[in-house]
Structures are given as C-alpha cells and as structure tokens.
Amino acid sequence: PGPREHVRRIVRRWGDPDGDGDPSDGVDGWRLDVAEMVGHGFWREFRGWVREVNPEAYIVGEVWWQDWPNNKMFDAEPWLRGDQFDAVMNYRFAAAVKAFFLDRRSAIAPSELDRRLARVRADYRPEVAPVLMNLLDSHDTDRLASQAVNPDTLHDHRVSARERPDYDVR
C-alpha cells in the first residue's frame, strides 16, 4: 500500500487494536508532530479515519513556528475549524506565562499577560480555547526548571549548553 493507506492502517490498528469495533482498548487521541509541514487536505482525511474508528478521540497538532528566526508563532486557526484538529499545543500560552512568571529584565506586566492570553482565546472558536494543550515545556523546549534559572531568553531560542556555555541546565 501507499503512504496514505499505511497511515490509515496505523489509525485502525492503534484506535481499535482487536478490530472488534469497540475503541475502548485503543488510544484516546493523537498528537501530531510538526503538523504545519503536512498539507491541510491530508489532515482532513486523517481526521476522517480517526473518527471512523473512534468519534471521541482527541486530535492535537503541533503547529508552532511560522518564522522561527523572528520569533513569530503560527496562528493555528486554519487547523482548528473542526475539520482537522481538535486542538493544538499552545506554545503561545507557554511563551506568555514564561515572560510573566520567569523573565526578569524582559518580564511582562499583568495587563500584558492578560492581553496575550486574551489574544489566544480570541484567535480561536469558543469551543477550541478550553481544549488547547496548554504546556510550560515539552521535548522541544528547555525544561521549566532550566527556564527558571535562565530567564530572559526567547522561547525555544538559544536555550541549551551547546549554544550558550553559560546556560544552566536543570
């Protein structure tokens, strides 16, 4: 089979391992890495395959950097119209919380934290905001403890001992 059929079989295998039509023994959801690098058409098809097996499965996409060098994150709304993902990993939340609670020189005021979080809520349909995958760190970012002792860095920019000899890994 081609790649599409291979992925469809994976969805069936993990969504209903014994193939009895009852997805209770399968996975409850899917986290899709670097999802912005795959076309919207494929994700629409993927959602259909998932819903065929388990209409209640949670689909979360990692839609992150639109322009990493300039610290611009995607507005993930195009993936969240009800035909692709249920949610995305909310790195915009993580960056705002880091700036408010951990940064020192570049700390933001409570009003700015409120503005940033309100912007995230406003960018998505009302039913999407409550199910976004809010996170403070991940396998792609430095650990929260490392962020705390290395304040005032851009989220996911030059945050490792390899890139900065003075970086304190926790």
Where are these regions (language model features)?
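Extended catalytic-interface subdomain
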Residues: 134, 139-142
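Chitinase-like catalytic core of GlcNAc-active glycosidases
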Residues: 1-8
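Short, intrinsically disordered, charge-balanced linker/junction segments flanking boundaries
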Residues: 1, 162-170
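Short, solvent-exposed beta-strand-terminating loops
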Residues: 141-152
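Active-site-proximal helices and loops of the catalytic beta/alpha 8
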Residues: 9-12, 19-132, 151, 157-161
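Hydrophobic side chains within well-formed alpha-helices
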Residues: 3, 132-135
